[in-house]
Each structure stands twice: as structure tokens, then as C-alpha cells.
Amino acid sequence: MSGEASTPAQDPSVEPLDAAPVAAEPEVMSTETPAEGSLTDPAERLQQLEHELQTLKQEHETLQSQYMRIAADFDNFRKRQSRDQEDIRQQLVCSTLSEILPVVDNFERARQQLNPESEEAQALHRSYQGLYKQLVDVLKQQGVARMEVVGQLFDPTLHEAVLREESTEQPEDVVIEELQRGYHLNGKVLRHALVKVSMGPGPSADAEGAASAEAEDS
């Protein structure tokens, strides 16, 4: 019937009396915190930053010191390795050259003792002398130099005294004869020279000299 009143179910704008109330949405609290500087006194913040800066400076100095130590250790290691390699090289060179020197001695003895007379012997002698000269030139190129010892004061760092004898020509402790040639290698002793050393004129010569002086005075 058109005259009937509308019921709540028929009118959507009217809420039913038994309807459950709608819960209100909870208020969301902000999780954002204010900036740290807004809660800290500027003087305290400055002090904190200065402390952090000082700590960083100390750490930097420590790392710098460690770096310098490591760099110095590495440099010393490199120099030590270089010296060791040079020492090994010098030892090998000295060992090799020391084995060659007796060959040079034999050439020099042959040169002094042999006196070839025939043309064939002279040709052979010249051939040997050519080899000797080449050998000496090679030694010079390697830094080997002969010692000059006769007339020099005896020096145990350079000479090895094999004989001692009286001499009226040279004073005591002066080298009067070279028995085996000595050599230097780049300024260092490669082989000591074997020498004969003067003992001076001796007591008999001194007595004769004193007697002669007395005779002249009388």
C-alpha cells in the first residue's frame, strides 16, 4: 500500500538501533625523533666533536708512524738484499779469478826461465806470450791490478813474509824480494804477495861499522 510507513530496513539513511558502533581509528604516534642537535647544548656538541677530532688525529699519527716503520724496514731489507747479492757476486768473481792467477804465475815463470834459440821455439814462445797478454788484459778489465812490493815497508795486510834475511842495502822490515806476485781487485786484496823481508844489516855489519868509525876517529 502506498500509505504504509517505510521501515528502517527500507530506509538506508537510518541506522538500525541494534547496529554495532564503528570503532574510531587510533591516533598514530609519530616515530620521528627531533634532530640530535635540537636536544644537545651547542657547547657540549662542540666539545664532543673536538674530542672525536682529537681521537682521529691520534689514530692518524699512529697509522703514520706504523707506515713509516714499515717503509723503513722495507728499505733496509732492500738495501740488505742488494748488499748480500753484491757480496755473493764479489765472492764468485774472487773465487774465479783466484783460480786463474796460478795460470798467470806459470806464464810468468816460463817467460823468465825459457830462452828459445831456434826459430820454431821462438815462434812457439811468441804464441804463449800472446796468450799471456790476452789473459792479463782480461784480468785488468775485471779490475785486477798487480801489487808493487819491492822496496815497500812490510805490511801484513798486503804481504806474507816467507823469508827474512840480513841486508846491507835495505833497513829492517823492508821488502827486498817478491817471491810470488800479489794482486788487488778493485782496491781490495785478491791475493797477498809472498815476499822476502830485510832484517837489517845484522850484528856483524854493525860491529864492522863501529870498528870503522873508531879507526877513523883514531
Swiss-Prot record:
GO terms for molecular function: adenyl-nucleotide exchange factor activity; protein homodimerization activity; protein-folding chaperone binding; unfolded protein binding. The keyword Methyltransferase does not apply. It is found in: Cytoplasm. HAMAP family: GrpE. One of its GO terms (biological process) is protein folding. Homodimer. Residues 1-10 have a biased composition (Polar residues). PANTHER family: GRPE PROTEIN, GRPE PROTEIN HOMOLOG, MITOCHONDRIAL. This is Protein GrpE. InterPro entries: GrpE (IPR000740), GrpE_coiled_coil (IPR013805), GrpE_head (IPR009012). Residues 200-218 have a biased composition (Low complexity). Transmembrane segments: none annotated. GO terms for cellular component: cytoplasm. Participates actively in the response to hyperosmotic and heat shock by preventing the aggregation of stress-denatured proteins, in association with DnaK and GrpE. It is the nucleotide exchange factor for DnaK and may function as a thermosensor. Unfolded proteins bind initially to DnaJ; upon interaction with the DnaJ-bound protein, DnaK hydrolyzes its bound ATP, resulting in the formation of a stable complex. GrpE releases ADP from DnaK; ATP binding to DnaK triggers the release of the substrate protein, thus completing the reaction cycle. Residues 1-44, 198-218 are annotated as: Disordered. Keywords: Chaperone, Cytoplasm, Stress response. The gene is grpE. Belongs to the GrpE family.
